[in-house]
Amino acid sequence: IPQQSSTTPVRPAESINTKTEVFFMRELRNTKIIAVDHGYGNMKTANTVTPTGIKAYKTEPIFTGNILEYNGIYYRIGEGHKEFIPDKAMDEEYYLLTLMAIARELNVFSIREADVHLAAGLPLTWIRTQREAFRSYLLQNPEVHYLFNGKEYHLRFVGCSLYPQGYPAIVNQLGNFKGTNLLADIGNGTMNILYINNKKAQESRCWTEKLGVNQCMIAAKNAVLDKFGVKIEESTVEQILRFGTADISAPYLDCISSIARQYVAELFSTLRKYEYNPDLMRLYVVGGGGCLIRNFGTYDKSRVTIIDDICATAKGYESLAYMSLKRRG
């Protein structure tokens, strides 16, 4: 029997503006394909972004908002970020964050019950060794019942596709990749680096560096503490990193901006270590680190493309999984 797709509209990832439009969910034979980008800073789906902070409560929290109820325990999600760990399958909280992310994505379409095929990813150089363990981790419960923000969800997991982080964000743009290109996926915990030559990813030329945005965050907070003797809110530093400014006095802003410029300089220094030469190749940047390069970096804008859509990788996961499942028939 030939496989048929649902009537749910499907459009290429790059044509969607997440600020104004919904990225339509892929579906095959009544199975929802849901992508989750497990970041150290944020959990992303095709249409949602949630900070990875999570805190457990034995009783229902006083304040509402982003509350997951699972196995009799309440979890408030979205306050702060998680610490870096090299193997997410060793951290049970990422499973809870996955359930939350799926619920948020389903809620966009007012869906409460679904057969789900997950699409997710791992850092480029870790996927070979961690793929099967992470797949088993995500599929540990074939059927799950839970509540998120007071709404009940019933999921049946039917499969899971895993991809290298970063690359899926640009897979729909490969037609523009002529000659030598370098992809840098700068997340909260790591920077993944991949060469793409004549539209083909070079698996032998990929690296993962622990040089994520969180290192800049820590350095900025420490610099303020050392120079002024005060602690600064992480949310204030994050605003400066994202937008280049914040409503604080000039000395504090200058201090944090200086650290951000040093961090971006280190990013480019690391890329050069892997033979990055702006005269000979184009650089594509995905992930949250792109805004730091834009705000604090010195670079040739005609040779560097910063992909602003923080959900681009999740959309890519979803597209790749949909195409793969459709080919299987």
Enumerate the predicted regions with their spans.
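Conserved blade-register residue in beta-propeller folds
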Residues: 45, 193-195
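Nucleotide/phosphate-binding catalytic cleft detector across ATP-hydrolyzing
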Residues: 2-183, 200-215, 227, 235-329
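Ser/Thr-glycine-rich phosphate-binding loops at phosphate-binding pockets of nucleotides
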Residues: 186-192
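A contiguous pocket-lining binding segment that forms or flanks enzyme active sites
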Residues: 223
